[in-house]
């Protein structure tokens, strides 16, 4: 969302992580408004005060939008790792996962550490490191990791997406 507010699915996935008390009804009303006005979900959040039926949730939605705007303003000055660390600090996501204490929460904490390591490595090796470039690289690796090695099919990709990958 910091990089691309037009990715409605991504915005909807993070709007309540960690929990912000924004209910499904509010999210659905914002989505309906976005669809009616032919705008992105994030753009609809930015004008939440004008959406009928949102009511008391406006303050929570405004807080979310303000956080994203603040992160966007820091983007040119922060490394990818610093930006991720700032998001974690501002949202208190790590704190929430630690208090959960479940196996899944511990796995997520380990994933966060791995993401931070990848961000640091990306900054060292990329010619012109950016959040967009990092997200593209991480998405590429995730796609390749999800491939089944023993599956009986051909995998096609662009030359751009194959850059930096190794094949047997």
Language model features by range: what are they?
Residues 1-168:
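Conserved helicase C-terminal RecA-like lobe
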């Amino acid at each position: 969302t910091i990089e691309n507010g037009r990715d409605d699915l991504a915005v909807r996935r993070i709007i309540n992580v960690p929990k912000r008390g924004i209910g499904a009804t509010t999210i659905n009303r914002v989505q309906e408004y976005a669809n009616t006005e032919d705008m992105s979900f994030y753009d609809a959040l930015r004008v939440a005060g004008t959406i009928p039926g949102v009511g008391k949730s406006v303050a929570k939605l405004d807080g979310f939008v303000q956080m994203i705007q603040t992160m966007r303003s820091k983007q040119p000055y922060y490394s990818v790792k610093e930006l991720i660390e700032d998001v974690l600090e501002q949202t208190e996501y790590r704190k929430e996962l630690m208090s959960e204490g479940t196996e899944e929460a511990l796995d997520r904490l380990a994933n966060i550490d791995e993401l931070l390591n990848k961000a640091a490595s990306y900054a060292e090796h990329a010619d012109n490191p950016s959040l967009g470039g990092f997200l593209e690289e991480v998405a590429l690796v995730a796609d390749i990791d999800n491939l089944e090695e023993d599956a009986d099919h051909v995998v096609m990709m662009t030359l751009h997406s194959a850059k930096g990958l190794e094949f047997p």
